[in-house]
Curated annotation (Swiss-Prot):
Alphabetized Pfam families for the sequence: Amidohydro_1 (PF01979), Urease_alpha (PF00449)
Matching Gene3D superfamilies: Metal-dependent hydrolases, Urease, subunit C, domain 1
Organism the protein comes from: Helicobacter pylori (strain ATCC 700392 / 26695) (Campylobacter pylori)
Principal subcellular localization: cytoplasm
Coiled coil location: none
Catalytic activity: urea + 2 H2O + H(+) = hydrogencarbonate + 2 NH4(+)
Lineage of the organism: Bacteria, Pseudomonadati, Campylobacterota, Epsilonproteobacteria, Campylobacterales
PTM annotation, UniProt: Carboxylation allows a single lysine to coordinate two nickel ions.
Name of this protein: Urease subunit beta
Positions that bind Ni(2+) 2: K219, H248, H274
Co-factor(s): Ni cation
Entry's induction text: By nickel ions.
Limits of the Urease domain: 131-569
Deletion consequences: Cells do not express urease.
This protein's GO CC annotations: cytoplasm
């Protein structure tokens, strides 16, 4: 067999085992752990290449042959960082490994058979990740959805009804009628969607009715009154219907302090939003719940990474989002109590320790919907620059840290909200919601987004040009966005109760409708690469944060990666 240099090999087939790839302009280095494509048997599409009839493409149609194969992709996932062909069939990932013609090539799996019905997408030199999942969405404007999608987010969970004051402040779609409208509106979009109902009620019947109307869980928010009674009732109903409860706790400590909230939760699983507290929650010590075994703690992206500008920008955001008035002294004091540089500084470190498990946006309500992925990687890079390599790393790479941070916006929010059977990772059997990145633009600008196995968004040149690449090149909607294809390519998530009662038929929905599962039988230990529990305390006078007796903090960055270099205009 003829041998070629590693440099030639990488230029032709992409990086292989032992090769290293820098993510964007960060200091994060991914090393290829394994290559499943088999040297000498690689797939390559194009003139004079191997992916042709009678060679890597079988002549014989079969029930196994793929709809699409992504060749020689570098997969970055919580399951590993490795190179493989990815086979897609019927909108799902059918196989990962060595694809091709099993009659002519060694090592080809039955579920990776290339035939006359197979389309090819060249993954050489590209990184493939699962689509991101943002679990903290205020559905204030529908324009958020394409903005998030272009960033690599393919699933949005939250609540709202548009720019009503309740939605500006809280991620809640309250009541059967509002849920009906939002479930119907979801039909329009290239995005998996799920809606949270109002959990602020000490009445089980009103709570249950919303779940049966299609909500996938509850949001309890202080602006509607996060009382111990509301917490208890929402969790009781959630346990009955197997749905998640998300909470924004009581900043003013009117109905109780953090200890009272934890007593009301009583060891049951709960997803805590913006657990640091600048986005809301018991002042000054809501952050201490992040160390508990039954809490799935999340950040929203305004506070990560911690920079020299973080504190200053929060006051105006808070005033607008929570309908406050700068001329009212008490409103200003309320805002001041939430913006604490000390706890914000600790948040970055808690992410690096795997104590915080999830990142999200808080879209248009103290959060930027298109920056979940970017800010997650900025935080990872900031922490590496400040604290060095993690002790868990093996070899001269950052693979463990990469898996830790990737999990925060992919598999962990999927597990938290009962959708990990469908999305959240690059695994066989899951929906083919995949994001393709050039390594140089990783975390900032995807090359292409595949939705339900079909190309939905891509960087594309002038439509009147003779080839696809001439300027201006920018994101353009592809065919999965249009006609009835969008119904097959996207999912509306509902509760099992609503699914069993035929919510799809009742509301005349054409999209895929799937039920959430296993929301209650999970704990912090189910959070991949982010399952650390600890005893956290906050000094009530200085706001300094201590983990197992040791102070944790970080410095505000005056420069971050993945920033203006990638956004000239």
């Amino acid at each position: 067999m003829k041998k070629i240099s590693r440099k030639e090999y990488v230029s032709m087939y992409g990086p292989t085992t032992g090769d290293k790839v820098r993510l964007g302009d960060t200091d994060l280095i991914a090393e290829v752990e394994h290559d499943y494509t088999i040297y000498g048997e690689e797939l390559k599409f194009g003139g004079g290449k191997t992916l042709r009839e009678g060679m890597s493409q079988s002549n014989n149609p079969s029930k196994e042959e793929l709809d699409l194969i992504i060749t020689n992709a570098l997969i970055v996932d919580y399951t590993g960082i490795y190179k493989a062909d990815i086979g897609i069939k019927d909108g799902k990932i059918a196989g990962i490994g060595k694809g091709g013609n099993k009659d002519m090539q060694d090592g080809v799996k039955n579920n990776l058979s290339v035939g006359p019905a197979t389309e090819a997408l060249a993954g050489e030199g590209l990184i493939v990740t699962a689509g991101g999942i943002d679990t903290h969405i205020h559905f204030i404007s529908p324009q958020q959805i394409p903005t998030a999608f272009a960033s690599g987010v393919t699933t949005m969970i939250g609540g709202g009804t548009g720019p009503a004051d309740g939605t500006n402040a809280t991620t809640i779609t309250p009541g059967r009628r509002n849920l009906k409208w939002m479930l119907r509106a979801a039909e329009e979009y290239s995005m998996n969607l799920g809606f949270l109902a109002k959990g602020n009620a000490s009445n089980d019947a009103s709570l249950a009715d919303q779940i049966e109307a299609g909500a996938i869980g509850f949001k309890i928010h202080e602006d509607w009154g996060t009382t111990p009674s509301a917490i208890n009732h929402a969790l009781d109903v959630a346990d009955k219907y197997d749905v998640q409860v998300a909470i924004h706790t009581d900043t003013l400590n009117e109905a109780g302090c953090v200890e009272d909230t934890m007593a009301a939760i009583a060891g049951r699983t709960m997803h805590t939003f913006h657990t640091e507290g600048a986005g809301g929650g018991h002042a000054p010590d809501i952050i201490k719940v992040a160390g508990e075994h039954n809490i799935l703690p999340a950040s929203t992206n305004p506070t990560i990474p911690f920079t020299v500008n973080t504190e200053a920008e929060h006051m105006d955001m808070l005033m607008v989002c929570h309908h406050l008035d700068k001329s009212i002294k008490e409103d200003v004091q309320f805002a001041d109590s939430r913006i604490r540089p000390q706890t914000i500084a600790a948040e970055d470190t808690l992410h690096d320790m795997g104590i915080f498990s999830i990142t999200s946006s808080d879209s248009q309500a103290m959060g930027r919907v298109g920056e979940v992925i970017t800010r997650t990687w900025q935080t990872a890079d900031k922490n590496k620059k400040e604290f060095g390599r993690l002790k868990e790393e093996k070899g001269d790479n950052d693979n463990f840290r990469i898996k830790r941070y990737l999990s925060k916006y992919t598999i962990n929010p999927a597990i938290a909200h009962g959708i990990s059977e469908y999305v959240g990772s690059v695994e066989v059997g899951k929906v083919a919601d995949l994001v393709l990145w050039s390594p140089a633009f990783f975390g900032v600008k995807p090359n292409m987004i595949i939705k339900g196995g079909f190309i939905a968004l891509s960087q594309m040149g002038d439509a009147n040009a003779s080839i696809p690449t001439p300027q201006p090149v920018y994101y353009r909607e592809m065919f999965a966005h249009h006609g009835k294809a969008k119904y097959d390519a996207n999912i509306t998530f509902v509760s099992q109760a609503a699914y069993d009662k035929g919510i799809k038929e009742e509301l005349g929905l054409e999209r895929q409708v799937l039920p959430v599962k296993n929301c209650r039988n999970i704990t912090k230990k189910d959070m991949q690469f982010n399952d650390t529990t600890a005893h956290i305390e906050v000094n009530p006078e200085t706001y300094h944060v201590f983990v197992d007796g040791k102070e944790v903090t970080s410095k505000p960055a005056n420069k971050v990666s993945l920033a203006q270099l990638f956004s000239i205009f």
